[in-house]
């Protein structure tokens, strides 16, 4: 079946060329798009007009030019999905944007969605996880690289989640993220995975965020926050320190539908598996490419277009203000498999126990052991900082990592990389 699927892709579509090596991903909460029966927000045709939102979306899409566009708060009807494609993506002679059929187990009035450039990728699978108050959607994509000819595929999994909003619903958000992490462990550990959406989290200390990035029991499934290495992780809510990273709200006043208060929360995320962060599986995060579109760091507790905007043109700032109370987040991924380049291998040596609370054992295969019986190791954190170096003697070595803070780490030896989690206690 897999070979037949690959064969059809090769026949039907051109393969990616070197000019298409970078993939742009954008995640956006569209604020009750096409939904006027939410029961939560006072959003009507008069103050959240779909036609005007489409005008804004086209402006933003033309500026960002994403290849993968995932959204939250999209109305649940098939007609709305078809209209969105026709009015905003497949326009001006373009016909390559695709999406998938709606799955809505929760029967929510707003759902998640994905739109993708079918010249570069195809959707193989769409699964909806039963989370509350709405489903979490899992989209498995395959890129059209030259490796398809050999029957190989480069996979990217996009998990779009929109857990419950509000300061008092941390337990609900934790339950949603536990469902996500359990599914990742069962199906996509050690693969290229993005988890994205409006997470409604006020601080990095929230248990749901910690579960995604640090505390989940299977270290293979943990996610990396691209803002970790630039100081973007912390107590985000109403904290000016994190002004460059906030995504909500785009306006300082409310008209009933849009939240007020200006930019003072980081609710919107794209987190990545370490396979993407480090480039283990032929897709690599482009360093420093992650940002909240339109956030110039100068609009803390202000409207996004107040007194101009240094990050985007005025037309884009105006569109961001008009369409939603959230900013979209975007990142770039480098797809390098079509040239057979892979300068970093995952595994090749054992690290155990994993997780660890103090000592790790590093075991090298005999063929990888240096002639003189010694080779250097480096231990790095998710921010790319080297924290420890030393020598592995022979085919095995004990390394004391008790002084490291709890979290995910990478150990580099002889051009190979493995990962481990440091934790305070083992259960």
What spans do the regions from the language model cover?
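Bacterial Sec-dependent N-terminal signal peptides
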Residues: 1-21, 341, 424-425
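Short glycine/proline-enriched turn or capping motifs at secondary-structure junctions
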Residues: 3, 321-327, 406-407, 414-415
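Intrinsically disordered, low-complexity Ser/Thr/Pro-rich tracts
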Residues: 4, 22, 48-51, 369-374
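Generic structural motif
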Residues: 4, 33, 118, 144-146, ...
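Hydrophobic alpha-helix-in-membranes signature
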Residues: 13, 65, 327, 352-354
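Divalent cation-coordinating acidic motifs and surrounding scaffolds
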Residues: 20-337
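Low-complexity, Pro/Thr/Ser/Gly/Ala-rich linker/spacer regions in secreted
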Residues: 335-346
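C-terminal outer-membrane/trafficking sorting elements
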Residues: 344-427
